[in-house]
Amino acid sequence: MANIAESAVLVSSASSAQAVAKLTQVRGPTSGFDKAQHIIGSYSTMGFQATNYGLARSIAQRMIRKQPPSKVYQIKDGKYVLVPPDVGEDGKTLQQEHVYPNLFMGVTANLMGTGCREAVRFLVQEGVVHRSLEASAPASADGTDDQLMFARLKREYVETYGGPPHPDEEIPRAHSFLCAIVVSGGGVEHDLRRACTAYTLHHYASEAQGHVSSTVSSEATAPPKGLQQRAEKPLGTRAAAGTAKPARFGNVEYPRQGSTGSELFDCLMRTFVQRLCARQARLRAAAMAKPIPDKYDDVCSWSVTPSEVWALCGLWLVDMLAEALGAVRSCTSRLTSGSAVGTAESVTANGKGPEADRDAHIATSASYRAEALARARTTVVYWAALQQVSLFSPSFVDGDITSYLLPTPAPAARPAHRKGGPVADENAGNSKELKRSRKASSSSSTSATAVKVKPPVVERLQVDLVRDVYSINKLAMLSKKTGMLICGGGVVKHHVCNANLMRNGADFTIILSNGQEFDGSDAGAKPEEALSWGKVRMEGAFVKVYGEVSTYLPLLLAEVFVPAVRQRRATDDAQPRRKRSSRGARPPQDVSGHSHLCRGE
C-alpha cells in the first residue's frame, strides 16, 4: 500500500513544468505610452479580450495571404478520412498551388448606420489580389452564380440604356478583399440613406439629455426645435407636418421616412422600386412570349433575388441619384419661387409627370451627375457592383424597401365635429380667418418639408430567396480556402456559417460580437459550437472577440487591411509592368476578364 501511495503522490512534474514554461507570460507595455500603435500591438499579451483581439489580428493577417488549399476529407466506414494529395506519373506528390482564401463577411444592419459602414466599404473597394487588365472573354457557363449574374445584368444594362453602367469609373486595379457580404434587412437602406442625408449623434435614450461624449457638440445632442415645441404642447394636439420624430437606434438618429431631410432618399427609393417593377414586367412579358418548354422548370425566370436587387441598385445608383437630385432640386426651387401649384402631382418618384417636367428632369439630371457620382462613391452597394461582390440579404423584407414596395394606405378622413371636440363657430368672419390661418400653416408646413412626392403605383415584386441560398452555398463549396469575418450575430452569422458548412467548415473565423452563449441563441454562440456543427474546420483557426463591433472593426482594418493595401500599392508603383495574378487555378472568366472563384497565381 505504501508503494502505491508513494507512486501516486511522488509523480514527476518535469513534463508539466516544461509545458508551463512554453506558455506566454502576461505583460503589458512598459514604455511608448504616447504611441497608440505600440499600445495596440501589445494587446496579445495583455490578457482578457485584448488577447482575443490580438489573436483575431493574426488570423486576419493569414486570411489575406496565399497558402495551400483546405484539406479534403471523405466519409469512409462512418469516419472522416483525409484524402491524400494527388500523385504524379513519377510517383511523387504534386505540389499544390497556393491560393488566397475567399472571405465571407456578415454585417448586421445597424452597423451600416455607424462608421463601420466606411470600414465595410474599404474592404469591398480595396484588395491585394491584382486584377487582370487584358482583353476579356465572356463569362463561361461553369462560372459561379454571382459572376453569371453580374455579366447578365451588365449586358441587360447596355441593351436597355445603350452604354456601360459605370462610364465615369475606372476598373479597380485589385479584386475586393471580400467575395460575398451577408447583410440583414435594412442595412443597404442605411447605406443609401447616408448617401442622401446625414446621420447625427445624440445621447442614448436611457441617458440624460446632457450626458454625451465630449466629442459630440451640445448643439448636435439637443433635440430639434420642432420636437421641443411639440413636447411643450398638451397631449392630443396635432404636430405640424415635417416635424416627425427622427428614427433612432442607440445614440444615432436619422430623418424618418417622409419627414424633412428624407426627401432625396424617398425619391431615390421610389425611383428604384419603379425601375425594379418595370424591369420585372419586361422580363415577365418576354417569358410569356416564349413557347411552353417540354421540360417543366420550377424556377420563375422573371423573379428577382435580394442579391440581384442590390446588384441592380449598384449599377443604377448614379443614374437614379442624378434623377432624384434633379427632381428634388427643381421642386424645391419652384416652392421657393412660389410658382408651384400642385407639386405633389407634377413630380412623381422617377421624375415622370407632365411632358415638360419630364424633359426638364432629363436635361437637368446630367448636370447633377457629378454630385450623384460623388454620393454614390461613398456607398457600399456602388463598390460592390463595381467589384462584382454579391450582397446577400436573407431578411430582405425587414428593410425599408418593403414600405416603398407596398401600397401606402390613404389617411382616414377626419370628422368635422367630434364629441368633446371644438364647436364650429357660427360667425362667418371667424370661420374665414380660421380657414386663412389653416391655409397659411399648410403653406408653411409645405415649405418646411420642401418636397412632397406622389407615391408611384407599383406592381408586386416577385422575390426569390431560395436562389440566393443556393448561390452562396455553391460559392462556398467551390472555394479552395475560406475565411469568415462576422460582425454581430443573428441571421447574418447563421447564413455565412451555414454556407461554409457545405464545404466542411471555414479555415479562418473571426467573430466580433457582444452576444453571450447562455441563452442558446445562434447570435451568442461561440466558434466551438460552430466547430461541432462543421461550420468551422477541425484544423481551422478561430476566435471570438467579446465586444462592440464599432470598437474592434476599425482597429482590425487599420492594423491588417490598410497596411496590406499600402504594400500592394507600393509594389504596383515600383513594378508597374509586373504580371498580374487572377483568382483560381481553373478560373472562369467574367465580362471584365478576372476570375472570382478562388484567388491564386
UniProtKB/Swiss-Prot annotation:
Residues 211-220 have a biased composition (Polar residues). Signal peptide: none annotated. It catalyses: [eIF5A protein]-L-lysine + spermidine = [eIF5A protein]-deoxyhypusine + propane-1,3-diamine. Residues 440-451 have a biased composition (Low complexity). Keywords: Hypusine biosynthesis, NAD, Transferase. It holds the Pfam family DS. Pathway: Protein modification; eIF5A hypusination. One of its GO terms (cellular component) is cytoplasm. Spermidine binds at E189, H190, H494, G520, S521, D522, E529, A530, L531, S532, W533, G534, K535. It comes from the Eukaryota. Its cofactor is NAD(+). The active site is at K535 (nucleophile). GO terms for biological process: hypusine metabolic process; peptidyl-lysine modification to peptidyl-hypusine. N1-guanyl-1,7-diaminoheptane has a small inhibitory effect on activity. Its EC number is 2.5.1.46. GO terms for molecular function: deoxyhypusine synthase activity; protein homodimerization activity. Catalyzes the NAD-dependent oxidative cleavage of spermidine and the subsequent transfer of the butylamine moiety of spermidine to the epsilon-amino group of a specific lysine residue of the eIF-5A precursor protein to form the intermediate deoxyhypusine residue. This is Deoxyhypusine synthase.
